[in-house]
Amino acid sequence: LKDPDLVDFTLDGAEAQYKAGEYDKLLAQCKQDAANTKWLEEGIRDIRFEASHDEPLCADEYAKQMKVSEEAVLDTQQNAGLNLTTCIGKKPVGDSAVRSICDRGMIGMNCYELLRKERRESLKEVLNLILAERKGAVQVKYSYDKVRAVHSARYAAIGNDKLLKIMDDYMDQNWPDREFEGGYLSHELMKVVIDLGAYKQQFFRKLPSGFSAGYTPAVMMISSDVAAS
């Protein structure tokens, strides 16, 4: 990475935390994430799952075939245990996509975990059989060499960088003296906390005197591409 402040989000467990005053770092990370993300519209009957077995010695060859990093292949072998064939080829599945995949495949998480641990070939067969009977389209989130979510075609995909821009514009109009308190990023969610202490009188003016002592008004924004759609 060119910027040492930016995080490589290839691994499923990648995350980043931001302290007060580090809003620019968060925004830069979100812009990098957007540059590394594609949303693919697929017919639900066109996507196909394959098992990803724990075969570290073959990871390099699999990575070449799928045109992804070896790191991504090894991580999926250890975690989600699935690859997905899309319009841009076969790609590893990230852990963050598992719940949305189970929703599409109409199987419970307990069933998924059992088959992932013991019978990955059976897992992909079950998913493919169910999807073959479904109709319509899905949106597939592909980011940092992996499939990160599978949602219905109605899902409104908005990048975190755009959400921050919308939030900034709103804050500029309503609370221009706000302060960035902290933030968090992972494949599962983005969380941003904004301190509105400069407007304490405005927010607490109708409360009894002394009731608001020790409290500070704030706004928390949470966004996720993992939630059900």
Where are these regions (language model features)?
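Intrinsic disorder/low-complexity polar-acidic segments
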Residues: A157-S229
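Feature for intrinsically disordered/low-complexity regulatory segments and propeptides
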Residues: L1-I166, W175
